[in-house]
From Swiss-Prot:
SUPFAM superfamilies: P-loop containing nucleoside triphosphate hydrolases (SSF52540), Winged helix' DNA-binding domain (SSF46785)
Region span, Head domain (RuvB-H): 264-353
Keywords, sorted A to Z: ATP-binding, Cytoplasm, DNA damage, DNA recombination, DNA repair, DNA-binding, Hydrolase, Nucleotide-binding
HAMAP family: DNA_HJ_migration_RuvB (MF_00016)
GO BP: any one term: DNA repair
Domain of life where this protein originates: Bacteria
Main localization category: cytoplasm
Family: Belongs to the RuvB family.
Binding site for ATP: 29-30, 71, 74-76, 137-139, 180, 190, 227
Entry protein name: Holliday junction branch migration complex subunit RuvB
UniProt gene name: ruvB
Annotated EC: 3.6.4.-
Region called Small ATPAse domain (RuvB-S), residue ranges: 191-261
Amino acid sequence: MIETDKLQAPRVISAQTADRQEDVVERALRPKRLAEYVGQAKIREQLEIFIQAAKNRHEALDHVLLFGPPGLGKTTLAHIVAAEMGVNLRQTSGPVLERAGDLAALLTNLEPHDVLFIDEIHRLSPVVEEILYPALEDFQIDIMIGEGPAARSVKLDLPPFTLVGATTRAGMLTNPLRDRFGIVARLEFYTPHELAYIVGRSAGLLDVAIDDAGAVEIARRARGTPRIANRLLRRVRDYAQVKADGDITAPVADAALLMLDVDHLGLDLMDRKLLGAMLEKFGGGPVGLDNLAAAIGESSDTIEDVLEPYLIQQGYLQRTPRGRIASASIWQHFGLAFPRRAGDESAELFSAP
């Protein structure tokens, strides 16, 4: 039987933003400049060129859209863009901007070339989005003054600014909004080598002794995500200080991560609950998203946005027109025999010695 207890505990390998105290620590570990930024080499190279060109012309950088799974550095890049441009950054999120006046207040307080960062930009309301279009294109907004028959529209000029939008669901952006971004970048999962470097850098900032093997052990279980790598590092640090001599080695990291229920594939209890339900209740699939969500008691959005991206990227899970299918490697990971299905050629392939 696949274990599914203790599933209500917070996920230590979740890439979602942590509580306020954890968020303060995460901000302290963020790189401040492109030269310090590790990974996403192509995006980093592009931004270096675009930023330098904008500075040479004494112009605001073109609007930037960053998308990809959570925890890969979209917010960090927004702060870096502002720092490299030498301007202020104003930060908000799509759900916070409920009314057109909320956005108008932000825009009218911007200084020339400032960066406005909107996280979860796909969640902007249609009313707010309509106000944003002329602001992005013409650096102007239309506001209504008065009510009833006496109401009139007034056009306000805005200073040139850069909008940096971040989203985990680029497909939910409307075409008119997406088309107004001059720079569009997708952030990819990090390699274990890149994450090991990030873990080593963060350990130095936290004044924690760690060897290369310990950094690699944490990195390979961090699901390709820097936010998770830094979170695991802090928990392994706690374990090392209490259960060991304070230094993080590979055996110490392994023991700490197993205590946290993070296995050698980087899967935690939530992942194993999802995959276990697919294997035990649906024979490995195909299974529809709604059925899977009902089986494990999670929302479809949580499965799509939080659980699936890494599992699909690693080949543990497949999306097909008929539904989700668990890969042969996951059957093996759970110690179960891969089923032979009639007419399934892959069963012959995976059952071969």
